Amino acid sequence: MNNTIETILAHRSIRKFTAVPITDEQRQTIIQAGLAASSSSMLQVVSIVRVTDSEKRNELAQFAGNQAYVESAAEFLVFCIDYQRHATINPDVQADFTELTLIGAVDSGIMAQNCLLAAESMGLGGVYIGGLRNSAAQVDELLGLPENSAVLFGMCLGHPDQNPEVKPRLPAHVVVHENQYQELNLDDIQSYDQTMQAYYASRTSNQKLSTWSQEVTGKLAGESRPHILPYLNSKGLAKR
């Protein structure tokens, strides 16, 4: 197993950081790794807003659900769909197709994971902040995003000040299907629930008595940010 694979498999979300800054060289390398990511049809429809202003960091932390590490991380990056670049080049660009919004979301995720993997390869850590979408319009206004662009998620990066366990994932045979979709075997989920129950009960922080099935059922039982589609539409995206 090479160093790249070891780094990927050792991924943990880091939510507590030291006060040590990320160097300019490290930051530039992380960004270059992101820019090297695959891009659908070479459209390059992602923009990153690096937030260094402490007041804006404080507001973003509140918008994300009072996640203090948005303020304390050495770096905070916000990943956005961006077709305004293209509309500036050619005003006839039709950015309102849902397909283009999906491309922007997919490419943003690919770019962000490249950034995070590059950071982790340097001994840094990070965590995604999807909670920005709780207040997408307010975040959008704070960052001054133009038409044809939209906020997707944030990313905290810094030197880890914690050493959490690696969270067990679903087994590959549950996730990977051969030739066609296979019906779920609930015995596999029951076994995984036992694994996750042991993990939740024994991890070093935020211990709880729960299973994966209970967690995802609670998460998916109600509405999930119903304001997102109107927000995207208001930015000229995902209209048709």
Curated annotation (Swiss-Prot):
UniProt enzyme class: oxidoreductase
Alphabetized GO MF terms: FMN reductase (NADPH) activity
Catalytic activity reported: FMNH2 + NADP(+) = FMN + NADPH + 2 H(+)
Source domain of life: Bacteria
One GO term of the biological process aspect: bioluminescence
Enzyme Commission code(s) on record: 1.5.1.38
UniProt keyword annotations, A-Z: Flavoprotein, FMN, Luminescence, NADP, Oxidoreductase
Residues annotated as binding FMN: 11-15, 39, 67-69, 128-131, 167-169
Keyword Iron set for record: no
Name of one Pfam family that matches: Nitroreductase
Subunit text: Homodimer.
Family: Belongs to the flavin oxidoreductase frp family.
Annotated function: Catalyzes the NADPH-dependent reduction of FMN to FMNH(2). Involved in bioluminescence by providing FMNH(2) to luciferase.
Protein name as catalogued: NADPH-flavin oxidoreductase
Source organism: Vibrio harveyi (Beneckea harveyi)
Protein encoded by which gene: frp
